Structures are given as structure tokens and as C-alpha cells.
Amino acid sequence: MARRARGTRVLRSVLVAFDPRRQRLRSLHAAFVLAAGVVGASCVPAGAPLVADKLHPCASTEGPTDGYCGGLEVYEDRAAASGRRIRLAIVVLPSVSSDVHADPLVFLAGGPGQAAAQMASQVQPLFRKIQRTRDVVLVDQRGTGKSSPLNCRGGGDSLRDLSEPDTDALEKLRTCLARLPGDPRFYTTNLAMDDLDDVRAFLGYDRINLYGGSYGTRAALVYVRRHGEHVRAIVLDGVAPMDMRLPMYAARDAQRALDRLYDDCWHDGACRAAYPRLAERTRALMARLDANPLRVTMPHPRTGVTEEIEVTSKLAASIVFRALYSPLTASILPSLIERAEHGDFQGLLALAFAGESATDAMSLGMQLSVLCSEDSPRYANEDLVRESLGTLFGTRLFTGQVAACGFWPKGRVDDAYYTPVVSPVPALVLSGELDPVTPPTWGLEVVKHLRNGRHIVMPGTGHGVAATACGNRLVTEFVDRGTAGGLDARCVRAVQRPGFFLTPAGPEPAPVALASAGAGDRR
């Protein structure tokens, strides 16, 4: 193996459906804390000399102070190769070893709309073991972070902003669109991955490893298709392929996760006794809110200021949807639903503010540029209705996105974009058994076309497998080996759903994973 020497807040009512992994970042945070002690901060960045002439040591406002920061200018309109230029923000976390592998790990953020370089301080602990022998590279994708961001923010911190009508949110979005400095047509995934290849060449890497989570898996697959000769291996964590047609299947996939919650509660005797007929009661609560939205007066979960908010079925459904991202937050849902039945919505509404900093960092304009160009042309309203039938969520969470795509500028995407990516590149495909947005079915579909791919389903896990101890070990070993063959995945057998909250004090000591049993390797 080659080696080298040392060297907005989002407008919630518009795009609440594919909200930026609010709950996933909560679970990631736990993994970050656990991983933070793996390598001491006193280690000397061995890979630094090879990037020092192109980047500069990061200031504390740019990224980790042991990293190198900088940028690369590219044309906004890559095909024309003229006109406006945009600067791509780059962070390199150099290897701490004196014997560094020449192929770095490149982190591709999710959303779409998250900024990878902006997340460097959060991401670094997750890949500490990989950073022992490899550089870790993060680039703010065009339209995000500090790379010509297409930021559209709306609302404030008040509770009433949670239930802002679509009409108000869409009007703010139109105003924002008119003021954006960039052309939203040029912020699609194809163009962004060509940017990434320019960054690869600029930094002097011949081959790279890719880690993509959620939308980042789509980006990784696109890079493999367009620049596969420069890819050593890829990790796809929570697969969102090009033909996913967001949010066409979102209600169906979320309902699957909610049904697993109901089943797991029923199979756990204590949960079944505490919350009998949970599915029936949840639907009854939504029906009540459909017929008569409630005006609730309560302290703001963060500020403590007493405010009034209208609780609609759409707001309640959106909170349930987001809570399902993480089994930890999902474990408290039965208790919060029971409280809401009796008119106490404080706990449920508090979940709406979980992971708020992640939401604020999301670029809504870039998100729309991707979804409206790549996904919305592939479905009609009747498709959304058909796929949402019989679900708790229906189409109510997605009406804002559909309306926004009616006026948002769209980039060019040809039909070939939606064909499966066929590649011999070694691939580790990870799916959370309880994932409400990128369930294992999507990973199973993608791995069929990856000749050297392996699909592992993590039981008791939601959106984001690498945040678990077992998942993190699998990612680290796979990147080190460069092949999924022979990878020991027995640790998945010990992963279980967290116990349900039976009292405000928390769950019973023993976790439950009864309906989630049987996960593991899936081809």
C-alpha cells in the first residue's frame, strides 16, 4: 500500500420532512464524547507539511486548532467555465502518525444542506482512530457553510414559529430567493462532486476513501460514478440513493419505524402495561388535533418565557417524525403521547427544539436546489398521496416542499443520473434497523450493484450507524483494511434498542430489542 512521509434556522413548516438529522446529531454527540479520549491533543500532526503550503493552521473560529484550513475557488457554472467564482471551504485534519497512508478519509455531510467543514470539530472525535494513520478531509459543499451558502432563515426562537403556516414560510422563501447572490441551478450533486475532485487534486491526493451519511451517501455514489478511478473504498451510512425521490416514500418509511416502536413496546411487558393500545391512542390524538387544534400556554423549553402556541396535527406529527431518528428520543415517545392525551404537550414540544443548533447550520437554499432539481421532477402529487395512505403522517409534512419546488430554480439533471451506480469499489453499507428515513431497504437495493459491497444492518439503531460503538469500530476497521470481506461484524448482536421511559426518571435498567431481533448482515 502506498504511503507517504510525515507530512435557520430552517423554515420548519416547509422542509420538516427531511429535517437535518436533529436526533442523529444528539446520538453522534454521545459517540464524539466517548471517542474524544482515543488520541491525546498533544499529538503532532504528521501530515501537516504536505498541506501547509496550500492551507493554513486553523484559527479557533475556523475549525480544530490542530487542523489546516483554506479554500479553493471554482466556477459556479462549471460548464461555462466563466462568470462568478465561488470559494470552497476546506478543513484537513492531518494524521497524527509518522507513517501516514496516502489515501485520506473524506467526510460527506448529510441534509442535504449540512456543511462538512463547519462540522469538523464535531466530526473529529468520531474518526480519531482513522486519523491515527490517515488525514481526514472535510469540504463545505457548494451552497453550504462558507462555500457560497444559499442560506434562507426564517422565524425566531418563539414557540409560535413551530406552527408557522406554509403560506408565511413560502413567502419568506420567495423573498430570500430574490436576494441570494448565487444561481441555485448550479448547486446540484453532480457539480458538487466535480468540485470535490478538484479539491482532491488541489490537495495532492491520488486516491481517497469516502464516508457519507444520509444525503452524503448519495454524494458518495455520485463521486464514485464520476471519479471512481480515484476511490479506494466507500462507507455508506443510512443510504439515500439518487432515485429515492424525496419525500415520496418518507411517510411510508417513517410509519415502518413507528410500527416497530409500537411492536417493541407491546413485546416489552412493562411498556405494554404502561401504555396499552399505543398505536390506537396515537391515532386518536392526531384525529383530535385534526378536528380541533389546541392552543397551549407553556414555558418555552429553552428560555422559560411563557408563550402560547397552536398545536396542530401537522406539528405533532412532525415532532414524532423527528423523534424517530434516534431510538433514545423515540423511547420517550409513549410517555409523551400519554401526557399529550391529557392536554400536557410540554414534553412533546420540547422535542421540537432538540438538536436546534444542527438545524440552524442547515442551508435551506442548497437543500431545495438539490431536492427540487433531483427529486421533485420524479414524482407527482398523486404519488405522494398513494405512498402516504394509511400512515400517521400522510402528506401533511411535505406540502411545503412540494410548493417550494414549484418556484425554486432547477438545475439540469439527465436521466442517467437515476440509474444504479455499478462499481467494483469496496463498500461498507450500513443501515439502522429502526431508521425512519433511510431504512435497510435502501441499503439492500444499492449494495446489489456494488460487487465488493457488504450490507450490515444494525439492530436497535436509528439514523446514523457510525455513532454507535459497534458501527464506529466497523467503519474504522473497514477503512483500515480497504475491504469488507472478512470484517468481523459480530458486535451487532449486542446492540439493542434503549429501554422505554416508564416514568419521568427514565427507562428500566434492561434494554429491549424484541421486535428488532434478527438484524445483522444483509445482502
Give the label of every model feature segment.
Residues G7-V14, F18-F32:
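Bacterial N-terminal signal peptides that target proteins for export
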Residues A30-A41:
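Bacterial N-terminal signal peptides
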Residues P45-L315, S369-R523:
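Gly/Pro-rich cap/lid or specificity-loop segments adjacent to the active site
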Residues P299-S318, Y325-L328, S357-G365:
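Structural motif
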Residues L324-E338, H342, P377-E382, V413:
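Short helix-capping/linker segments at secondary-structure and domain boundaries
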Residues I332, G355-E356, G400:
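Intrinsic disorder and flexible/low-complexity segments
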Residues Q346-D375, Y379:
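Long, low-complexity segments enriched in small/aliphatic residues
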